Each structure stands twice: as C-alpha cells, then as structure tokens.
Amino acid sequence: MSFASETKKELTNLDVKDCCTKAELSALIRMNGSLSFSNRKLILDIQTENAAIARRIYTLLKKKYDVTVELLVRKKMRLKKNNVYIVRLVERAKTILEDLKILGEQFVFERNISEELVKKRCCKRSYMRGAFLAGGSVNNPETSSYHLEIFSLYKEHNDALCELMNQFHLNSKTLERKKGYITYMKEAEKITEFLSVVGAHNSLLRFEDVRIVRDMRNSVNRLVNCETANLNKTIGASLRQVENIQFIDEKIGLDALPDKLREIAKLRVDYQEVTLKELGEMVESGKISKSGINHRLRKLDQIAEQLRNGQAVTLK
C-alpha cells in the first residue's frame, strides 16, 4: 500500500463531531459527487476507487441524516480495471445537499466553500480532510521530492481550498493542470503540518521518521563527498609538489636549496600522504604552522617553474 493510501486509510477511521461531519461530507460530495434524475427523483452518486473512503461516506451519511444509502461496486474496464465504489443517495438527496451548502441553482454544485460550513476551526480541518480524501495525493517521503496536492475540477473551489489551507499557515499554492486545478505544497515541514491539521498523526510520524533518516543520509553523503573532494585536492597538491621537488633535485640538487626549503622538500618526498598540518609537526627544527609549510612549498613550486622556463632561480 502506498504512503498516500495508508494516510487516507488512517483518516477514514477518525471520529468526528457532528458539525465536522457536515464539513467533511461537503468536501467529499462536492469533489466526487454527481447528480442525475430518475423517475423525477434527484439521485446523488459519490464515486471513488478507495473502499475505505466509500465506507466512510456511507457511514457519515447514515450517522448524520439516518437515510437509506446504497453502496454499489463496479469494475473498470480500462487500464488497471480497479473496482469503482458508488455511494448512492436517493432519499432526501436535495434536502441533504442543501444542508451541506453545496447545491446551487439548476441543480449544480456550488463552487465556493460556504463560510457558515467552516466557521469553526475544527470544521475547517474536517473540510480539508474531506478534500484530501476526495482528491488528494502525497508522495512517499522516501522519494526524491516532497509533494502533496489536492485536485479540483473548478478554479473557484481550488482557490477557496487554497485560501482555507493557508489559514493554517501551510504556504500552499495553486496550479492549473490539463483537466483541472491543484492546490499543492512541496515543503516537508508544511506537509507534516498538513497531516497534523487533518488528523493523520500516525502518517505524520512515519513521514518524519523517514525524512529524518533521509536528511541524515544526505548530510552524511555531503560530508563524505566534501571529505573526498578535500582528500583528492590534498593528494593532487602533494603529487604536484613531489614532482616539482624531484625536478629540482634532478636539475640543481636539493643541497643547493636553503636549509628551510631543503628540510621541507625531503619531508614532503618521504611523507607524501600527510597533510600540511602534519608535515609542520615533523620539522626537527621546531613545529611550523600550516601557513608556514604552505609558503615554503609554494616557494619550491616557484623554483621548479623558473627552472622549467630557463629563468634565473631565486633560492632565498
């Protein structure tokens, strides 16, 4: 089961207050519902491919309105051929839709979110939970990028949902897609805050656990890469220095060098793998700082370069 599916399953098991039931149902029906007429009766169908969400809608309708609700199961004939669950409401459909503040003129759904429906903070949370159950998805935190989104068919509803979410400082944004609109967020911290707001606390803990391990692994990798780069740089510099010292030895001999340069030249050839700091601690005449060692090695590089170019050599 995907992380998104596990999150939705957790949300379908939450208990909700009476006022919050209306908010959650309103989002679920507005986003997944459709209306039709049969024998002059208004029929509401709420469709989903998630059995847990279908049970959730069925249970909330029965609990809130004590009406007869049908649950139909059909098989998709294309692509994955998943089951499609249809929660059908015939009894008092118009009255219930009006109570949920989503039935507009000419029997079409309102595209805005009723302020009366989400007046309380707990109801705002429940509406967001219903919207996520109806059209939401969230990437597995182990994947390369963090992403949570909720899909809406209509721009007005998408904008209203984004505004509602940002009342909780989630920094969500909107984007037009080919067949609708999405409200989304890409910051890991904001995704965990969203999961907390809608009540998916177990999923939040799992997300955070994976994120911490992932961030730690990335930090270790960056540190290793940095250390490797520094090591390669040190080795490269050491090889260049040894090559220059050997060239000087071939051309004029190390004995021609001043004592301070000769001492460092011999140490570098004998201990090619050590750092400048370690090299400075090996000097018999007394410990020399890293910058002091670096200065003398640069002087040796300069002498080698002068010899290669046939220039007069400055030994002091």
Curated annotation (Swiss-Prot):
It comes from the Bacteria. Keywords: Cell cycle, Cell division, DNA-binding. InterPro entries: Homing_endonucl (IPR027434), Sporu_reg_WhiA_N_dom (IPR018478), Sporulation_regulator_WhiA (IPR003802), Sporulation_regulator_WhiA_C (IPR023054), WhiA_LAGLIDADG_dom (IPR039518). Pfam families: HTH_WhiA, LAGLIDADG_WhiA, WhiA_N. This is Probable cell division protein WhiA. Residues 275-309 bind DNA. GO terms for molecular function: DNA binding. PANTHER family: CELL DIVISION PROTEIN WHIA-RELATED (PTHR37307:SF1). Belongs to the WhiA family. Involved in cell division and chromosome segregation. It comes from Bacillus pumilus (strain SAFR-032). One of its GO terms (biological process) is regulation of sporulation.
